[in-house]
């Protein structure tokens, strides 16, 4: 049941991060696990997470004696295949530059660390390149700094020399944006520092600047823990320095806090400096530290373990305080309040959702199976009836109904799970829709849900509020946070909060046993949060309830003195209780203001369009990269001015608008519309209207038509793919190792997709391709690529959601709206298709898109003819008739014997449409009008197309239609270009025939056949 309550939403919070100490797996559990994971062994290294306490019922339970001694290795997960801080610079989809060295500086204050990393990459090619810098961050890390520049060193340099390294004096680990570049003045040439810019404007400015062959870069949020930065130019035969700065919270283990730095193994040289304020800090591997004032510094060169950990013994509730010179004072604290624990009644039936996507391969899947076995074994009396839904882009049930939770059934389940392939993207929304309303269930029932997934929804619905609505009327959802990189904690928190469930932290095997029963504890309703001496108090995650053992990140404004306390008001059975937790001694830290800014931005972003302006102001001021803003660097100040990127009144907005009060006020006004698809579409139109780079004008008649459309017209549910191939044994021989290494070859994946299309089904083919999206979330080129393939496979709902993600990130590219309209038309969603067809016709788009308007008008006219003459239900048929009459008169072409359109998926690419007529005359970019009346639209040499050929009266004979591939982005080494072609015969008549085709263009091959038409 949805449990959002305004009185609780006024505060914020972190859904239950509960951690428990394992008292020992049963022999049966171990035997079950042996069946499932014997072939899924991962690399090793500890990965601790959060607090564990002994003797607490439910979510607070377990744990040893806290800070008296460090936990052993069994308290943490092994080192994952997906290593935090790992990076690469891709030039195309197959080639990457070599990482020569990596220098890392870590500053730890209380529960938080600031990390600055210098990467040195070599372009050993003889030509300039554009690269995509991909960085995998630790869980919940928040980047705030990005810079890029060429060095004077040759690419052949292997070991960094002293001038290439950044000198670090005792205690001087510069991490403020104003200091980082200054400290590196001698280390690079003409470096560029990124600025915070609204995300849509950053994408537009970047694309425009690349076309001028100058030096931009953009850092974008691309999914959980994944940031993508396009860098240009990468000079030939030179080393290039990329600097990244981010903040991350330490992990609580027992009563201790731990920071863990994972180093990628591909770095040929690594230097690490760590500075800590806590005198009790211990470090592993052990090295001698040096004292510098109140801080202790540790230095490493080429550490063999590739993992460095810092343990703070029993720090209590660390309190960071700091000032922003333009705004005022801020504080941040991490607290685990003591709450009484008691058992709660629950459903005796449960559905487990187990993520089998590529991101689970292999490390997470092993964890999910261990958790699954423990929960089933230790809750046999309470969870009597179970079923399991395994999901990625597809979803399939273990059994066609609930089965008894018996040891024999659990053993069978785990044996079956061990046979599954781990591939594909993650369609979380489709899985939740199926889990809450199983196809095999005749009579709806209320059952609890256990989500064993990283929560990163890389496929299908991406609106978190819309996904949350799928839980309306369902039982509680419980999720588990492993601490592994790539976890979308915000999604897990949101879903558990909305369903009345909880998220439990499971740092390692030692915490599984208690976490397995944590859901049985009774939650406390959160009524209020105060901090003595503080104001504008926010709690990360916006919980409606607290569980015993809860770890809360609390931030706010004000100057806190010694003796400050967190004061919670909680309620159970109508009885209120005040819980007071003393905070630690204040630690002066520059990290406190940004900790506040990060949580405040997350609050405001959650309310979407209603607080979009304030969210951007907060994100810009506190340098919070994510859903609202990107880091963008351009060549000069003039370039920033050219795109209207200038300092706004962000400081004033942040100072004058406390986030907590604004959040509470706007939430009360907008709660009913969050997740509503019609409201989301109207918000899209509002953003387009406010975008100065588009200059869109929305007619009143269109607004009226949108208002007439029912809410259902805007819903585009995407059912899980109905695949046939699910077993690991059914994978291509060479594919399984690639998936396990997360080292995907585009050619291998596309070959696998072609084989599956022939041998199994289109859905199986698309599942193979979706692994590219899972591995590269946020990559618009890949999303378009796979979207075109989905259209070609006849899977139009999947294509629509891929194109929608591209449009969200690149709203200034009009061809995407046309693609969305085409997909919707194929789905029979005619009202929404009409709405999207109109968008390219309402804006003033960049000239590089050629005669886009003419092509969309012809396409739209074809659609309107079908809508007005067909039987598809529409709420705006009168509007469609009026638009049909107006467009037909405007175009002045009632019919045509042959119409051909092409569009493609890569920017800065010159693809030309060539049509050879029966006479032998060829219509192409330099001969656009033929003697028989054939015409071609203007040549598009920079964008994504489209181009169109029209012949009204076609002489009899053969028409050869081809795409000529003259130029791709010269700065990329090997990205693919795909053409989506539509061929109309007898356009505008009852004999009209439509052929759609996707053609992959091969580098080095100029001419590619599309179709042959006989008249």
Regions found by a protein language model. Give the residues of each.
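An acidic, Ser/Thr-enriched
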Residues: 145-222, 226, 230-353, 479, ...
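VWA/integrin I-like adhesion module and closely mimicked acidic/polar interface patches used
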Residues: 453-499, 504-506, 511-518, 585
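Short beta-strand-loop
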Residues: 387-416, 439, 459-465, 489-493
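N-terminal, polar/Ser/Thr-rich
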Residues: 20-110
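Intrinsic-disorder/low-complexity signal
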Residues: 874-1015
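Von Willebrand factor
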Residues: 345-404, 409-453, 481-488
């Amino acid at each position: 049941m949805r449990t959002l309550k305004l009185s609780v939403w006024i505060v914020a919070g972190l859904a239950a991060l509960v951690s428990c100490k394992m008292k020992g797996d049963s022999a049966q559990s171990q035997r079950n696990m042996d069946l499932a994971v014997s072939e899924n062994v991962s690399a090793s290294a500890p990965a601790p997470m959060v607090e564990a306490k002994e003797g607490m019922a439910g979510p607070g339970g377990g744990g040893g004696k806290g800070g008296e001694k460090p936990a052993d290795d069994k308290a943490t997960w092994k080192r994952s295949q997906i290593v935090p801080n790992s990076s690469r610079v891709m030039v195309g989809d197959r080639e990457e530059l070599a990482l020569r060295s990596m220098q890392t500086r870590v500053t730890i204050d209380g529960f938080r660390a600031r990390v600055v990393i210098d990467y040195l990459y070599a372009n050993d090619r003889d030509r300039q390149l554009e690269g995509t810098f991909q960085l995998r961050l630790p869980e919940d890390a928040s980047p705030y700094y990005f810079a890029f520049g060429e060095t004077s060193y040759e690419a052949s340099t292997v070991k960094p020399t002293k001038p290439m390294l950044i000198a670090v004096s005792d205690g001087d680990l510069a991490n403020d944006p104003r200091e980082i570049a200054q400290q590196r003045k001698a280390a690079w040439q003409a470096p560029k520092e990124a600025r915070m810019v609204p995300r849509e404007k950053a994408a537009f400015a970047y694309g425009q600047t690349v076309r001028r062959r100058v030096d931009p870069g953009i850092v974008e949020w691309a999914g959980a823990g994944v940031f993508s930065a396009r860098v240009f130019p990468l000079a030939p035969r030179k080393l290039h320095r990329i600097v990244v700065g981010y903040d991350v919270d330490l992990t609580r283990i027992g009563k201790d806090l731990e920071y863990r730095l994972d180093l990628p193994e591909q770095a040929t040289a690594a230097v690490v400096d760590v500075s800590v304020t806590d005198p009790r800090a211990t470090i592993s591997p052990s090295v001698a530290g040096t004292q510098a004032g109140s801080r202790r510094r540790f230095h490493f060169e080429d550490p063999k373990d590739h993992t460095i950990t810092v343990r703070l013994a029993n720090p209590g509730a660390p309190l960071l305080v700091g000032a922003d010179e333009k705004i005022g004072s801020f504080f941040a604290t991490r607290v685990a309040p003591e709450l009484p624990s008691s058992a709660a009644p629950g459903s005796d039936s449960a559905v487990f959702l187990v993520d089998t996507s590529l991101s689970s391969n292999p490390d997470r899947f092993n964890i999910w199976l261990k958790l699954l076995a423990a929960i089933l074994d230790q809750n046999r009396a309470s969870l009597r009836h179970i079923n399991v839904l395994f999901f990625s882009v597809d979803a399939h049930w273990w059994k066609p109904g609930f089965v008894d939770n018996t040891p024999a059934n659990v053993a069978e389940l785990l044996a079956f799970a061990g046979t599954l392939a781990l591939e594909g993207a993650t369609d979380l929304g489709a899985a939740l829709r199926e889990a809450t309303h199983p196809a095999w269930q005749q009579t709806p029932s209320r059952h609890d849900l256990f989500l064993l997934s990283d929560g990163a929804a890389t496929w299908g619905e991406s609106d978190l509020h819309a996904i949350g609505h799928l839980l309306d009327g369902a039982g509680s959802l419980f999720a588990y946070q492993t601490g592994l990189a790539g976890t979308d904690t915000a999604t897990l928190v949101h879903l558990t909060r909305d369903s009345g469930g909880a998220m439990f932290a499971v740092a390692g095997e030692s915490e599984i046993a208690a976490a397995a029963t944590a859901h049985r504890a009774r939650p406390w309703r959160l009524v209020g949060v105060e901090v003595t001496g503080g104001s504008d108090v926010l709690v990360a995650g916006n919980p409606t309830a607290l569980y015993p053992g809860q770890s809360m990140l609390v931030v706010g404004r004000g100057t806190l003195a010694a003796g400050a306390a967190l004061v919670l008001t909680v309620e159970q059975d109508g009885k209120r209780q005040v819980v007071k937790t003393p905070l630690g001694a204040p630690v002066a830290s520059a990290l406190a203001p940004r900790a506040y800014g990060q949580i405040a931005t997350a609050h405001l972003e959650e309310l979407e369009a209603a607080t979009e302006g304030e969210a951007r102001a907060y994100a810009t001021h506190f340098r919070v990269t994510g859903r609202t803003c990107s880091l963008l660097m351009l060549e000069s100040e003039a370039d920033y001015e050219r795109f209207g990127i200038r300092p706004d009144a962000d400081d004033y907005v942040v100072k004058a608008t406390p986030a907590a009060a604004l959040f509470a006020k706007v939430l009360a006004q907008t709660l009913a519309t969050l997740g509503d698809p019609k409201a989301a579409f109207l918000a899209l139109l509002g953003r387009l209207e406010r975008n100065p780079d588009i200059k869109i004008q929305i007619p009143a008649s269109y607004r009226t038509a949108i208002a007439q459309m029912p809410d259902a017209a805007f819903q585009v549910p995407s059912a899980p793919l109905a695949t046939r191939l699910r077993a690991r044994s059914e994978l291509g021989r060479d594919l399984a190792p690639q998936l396990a290494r997360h080292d995907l070859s585009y050619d291998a994946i596309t070959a696998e997709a072609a084989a599956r299309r022939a041998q199994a089904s289109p859905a199986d083919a698309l599942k193979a391709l979706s692994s590219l999206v899972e591995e590269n979330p946020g990559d618009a080129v890949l999303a378009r690529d796979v979207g075109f393939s989905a259209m070609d496979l006849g899977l139009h709902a999947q294509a629509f959601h891929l194109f929608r993600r591209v449009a969200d990130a690149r709203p200034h590219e009009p061809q995407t709206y046309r693609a969305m309209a085409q997909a919707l038309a194929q789905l029979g969603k005619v009202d929404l298709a009409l709405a999207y067809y109109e968008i390219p016709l309402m804006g003033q788009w960049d000239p590089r898109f050629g005669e886009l308007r003419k092509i969309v008008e012809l396409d739209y006219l074809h659609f309107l003819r079908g809508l007005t003459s067909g039987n598809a239900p529409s709420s705006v048929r009168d509007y469609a008739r009026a638009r049909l009459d107006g467009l037909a008169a405007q175009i002045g072409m009632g019919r045509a014997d042959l119409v051909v359109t092409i569009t493609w998926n890569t920017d800065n690419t010159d693809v030309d449409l060539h049509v050879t007529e029966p006479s032998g005359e060829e219509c192409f970019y330099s001969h656009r009008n033929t003697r028989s009346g054939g015409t071609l639209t203007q040549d598009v040499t920079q964008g994504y197309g489209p181009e169109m050929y029209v012949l009204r009266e076609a002489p009899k004979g053969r028409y050869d239609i081809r795409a000529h591939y003259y130029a791709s982005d010269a700065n990329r080494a090997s990205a693919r270009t795909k053409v989506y072609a539509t061929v109309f015969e007898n356009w505008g008549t009852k004999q009209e025939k439509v052929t759609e085709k996707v053609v992959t263009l091969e580098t080095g091959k100029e001419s590619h056949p599309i179709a042959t038409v006989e008249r």
